[in-house]
């Protein structure tokens, strides 16, 4: 669902903003490489986390996307940086779409932040079958 939604939104001119995390974030960024994606990071922009997304992170930076962070260069991600990253994701976004989220997840922090910033996240009761 994340791949399809990101591809379709990108083709309509929207830039996909996500956190370069495993799963849904990875699928969303990969689907939007050709149309525009921004990776908000919990580490310095030169420290791609998780390591398994190194190639994707490099592609984002090389292919016209953007990696951004409030953390200084060289800084590894720390637990306190993830809510800050989620605030950036929400702040850059016209709408926040949560495709899948655990009860205690960054996705729900991002959705709550969007509400605090005056935006209503779109909701669906569809069950995604895969990222």
Give the label of every model feature segment.
Residues 1-131:
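Glycine-biased, small-residue-rich flexible motifs in mid-sequence functional cores and linkers
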């Amino acid at each position: 669902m994340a791949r399809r939604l990101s591809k379709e939104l990108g083709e309509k001119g929207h830039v996909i903003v996500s956190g370069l995390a495993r799963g849904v974030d990875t699928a969303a960024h990969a689907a939007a490489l050709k149309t525009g994606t921004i990776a908000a990071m919990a580490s310095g922009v030169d420290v791609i986390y998780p390591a398994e997304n190194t190639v994707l992170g490099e592609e984002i930076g090389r292919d016209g996307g953007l990696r951004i962070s409030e953390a200084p260069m060289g800084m590894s991600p720390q637990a306190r940086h993830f809510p800050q990253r989620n605030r950036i994701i929400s702040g850059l976004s016209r709408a926040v779409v949560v495709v899948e989220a655990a009860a205690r997840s960054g996705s729900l922090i991002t959705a709550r932040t969007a509400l605090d910033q005056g935006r209503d996240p779109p909701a669906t009761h569809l069950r995604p079958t895969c990222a």
